[in-house]
């Protein structure tokens, strides 16, 4: 996932990675490792950080010392995290409605967003009963939701042997069209 995101970002600076529903914050840390700009930072946010997240982070730092001081962990709800237009908001396997909340938070500030959704809730969606892949339809709707908010969206996948929930949504605000003088 991180290599797909880094390729999508291309040569644009990462700036700050904000990993929502981060768990151990490994996605954010790998994105920093893939970024040539050592000034990039990361904020790993989860309402319940794993008890041993500091031990895991210390092990990562021991192997990759250039990450020291660049990753901050925050225990918070998604709606309490300050985001900015220059951020890259990422999330891997944000369950159900959390995927929608991640997209909503990123779009509210015009930040770039990369999301690997999971746990697609279909209980209250009778329109999806006859669909072969209801999760694909939900993710199409998420992509269209971003497009309606002025985003360019790419729907990609990561290898299925990495995760069966492997659809990756990548969105960035469309560049403003220059107006004639």
Which residues does each PLM region occupy?
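Class I S-adenosyl-L-methionine
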Residues: 2-181
